């Protein structure tokens, strides 16, 4: 039950093999069934929007700088090493992270735990900018499907116009929501799927009349 756009971004980033293990905790923390906890209090600065759970590559970079004084270059190298599973590189950087964090007054055992958590999820971690783009598309399409369901389904059918199996599934889904899909009609149909004045979806003429587009234009020039 996302309540903010940030929740959509996190959902997109979490739904992959590594971070997926954290989904139950993320949900419970969001809905108040579990307390929001931070391994080190200052981590709230970058983990507040994700309820104390590291979700994005950018968070790993920012936290490595905050906790252990990594430079921008070192934090980016850490991101690359985790993303590409470069074990030798990670083993080389871990002591620097632990020691840098210790110098800043953080418990080495807690730092070990943080590093282990990062290793578990980071190989599949998504960067936030990509997750944001995908979530924006999801938000737009969800809005269209909720507010213009017939038009949305007609457009989706047109997008899958050469896949009859997918069109059949979409027709069934439309029917379940009260939207009927009707056969072609020379007075109502367009080239592809469309919606008539009654809110029904009409098959496009191009699916049934196996002629060139130019021939269809001569038959009904106003609709193509």
Question: Can you annotate each of these PLM segments?
Answer:
Residues 1-224:
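Noncatalytic, beta-rich nucleic-acid-contacting surfaces in large DNA/RNA-processing enzymes
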């Amino acid at each position: 039950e996302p309540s903010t756009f940030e929740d959509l971004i996190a959902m997109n980033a979490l739904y992959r093999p590594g971070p997926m293990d954290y989904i139950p905790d993320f949900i419970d923390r969001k809905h108040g069934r579990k307390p929001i906890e931070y391994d080190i209090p200052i981590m709230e600065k970058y983990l507040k929007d994700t309820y104390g759970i590291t979700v994005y590559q950018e968070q790993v970079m920012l936290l490595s700088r905050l906790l252990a004084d990594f430079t921008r270059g070192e934090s980016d190298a850490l991101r690359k090493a985790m993303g590409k599973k470069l074990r030798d590189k990670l083993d080389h950087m871990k002591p620097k992270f632990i020691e840098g964090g210790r110098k800043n007054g953080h418990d080495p055992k807690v730092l070990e735990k943080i590093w282990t958590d990062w290793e578990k999820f980071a190989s599949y971690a998504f960067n936030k900018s990509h997750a944001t783009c995908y979530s924006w598309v999801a938000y737009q399409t969800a809005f269209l499907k909720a507010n213009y369901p017939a038009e949305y389904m007609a457009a989706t059918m047109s997008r899958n116009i050469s896949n009859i199996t997918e069109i059949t599934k979409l027709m069934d889904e439309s029917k379940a929501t009260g939207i009927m899909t009707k056969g072609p009609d020379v007075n109502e149909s367009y080239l592809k799927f469309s919606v008539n004045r009654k809110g029904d979806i009409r098959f496009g003429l191009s699916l049934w009349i196996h002629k060139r587009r130019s021939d269809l234009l001569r038959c009904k020039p106003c609709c193509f």
